[in-house]
Amino acid sequence: MHATTIVTVRKGNKVVIAGDGQVSLGQTIMKGNARKVRRIGKGGNVIAGFAGATADAFTLLERLEAKLEQYPDQLTRACVELAKDWRTDRYLRRLEAMMLVADKSVSLALTGTGDVLEPEHGVMAIGSGGNYALAAARALMDTDKDAEEIARKAMQIASDICVYTNNNFVVETLDAA
């Protein structure tokens, strides 16, 4: 998954998803201020960030919103139901995207193979700069920094290293349970 970095951090009473704004086509930067992190669900009670092919990501985001309408306040169930569809539907199986989603209780990654994963250490990252952001965020979890500070610093480090990630960040925060 090229051309983006998305990170989620859950620490203390906050959960954050942050993403950069760069859209690349091959080796060309097409846009620097894309919004790959957004609030979804009833009242914006879920935050989601996506990496991968833009049209594919929007398709999955729409499908997740439909599942959240079907299973309100049940993010895990909505994601599992979406993953089932993703694995069994011929059209959806061809989509090349990943998503990180979070609500007040849980953070999850939805992969292109239909997996639904919860982070072991409260941190997950996807995209071309995901490994850099993940390492940075994990290193910062034992500091006094809050979830948003950790996410921003992790994104800054990823943008300094990954050529497909810029420093035009969108950050969304929720109060955690």
Swiss-Prot record:
It is found in: Cytoplasm. GO terms for cellular component: HslUV protease complex; proteasome core complex. Signal peptide: none annotated. Keywords: Allosteric enzyme, Cytoplasm, Hydrolase, Metal-binding, Protease, Sodium, Threonine protease. Pfam families: Proteasome (PF00227). It is an enzyme of class 3 (hydrolase). The keyword Metal-binding applies. The active site is at 4. GO terms for molecular function: metal ion binding; threonine-type endopeptidase activity. Allosterically activated by HslU binding. PROSITE patterns: PROTEASOME_BETA_2 (PS51476). Its EC number is 3.4.25.2. It comes from the Bacteria. Na(+) binds at residues 159, 162, 165. GO terms for biological process: proteolysis involved in protein catabolic process. It catalyses: ATP-dependent cleavage of peptide bonds with broad specificity. CDD domains: protease_HslV (cd01913). Protease subunit of a proteasome-like degradation complex believed to be a general protein degrading machinery. NCBIfam families: ATP_dep_HslV, PRK05456.1. A double ring-shaped homohexamer of HslV is capped on each side by a ring-shaped HslU homohexamer. The assembly of the HslU/HslV complex is dependent on binding of ATP. PANTHER family: ATP-DEPENDENT PROTEASE SUBUNIT HSLV, METALLOPROTEASE TLDD. Belongs to the peptidase T1B family. HslV subfamily. This is ATP-dependent protease subunit HslV. It comes from Mesorhizobium japonicum (strain LMG 29417 / CECT 9101 / MAFF 303099) (Mesorhizobium loti (strain MAFF 303099)).
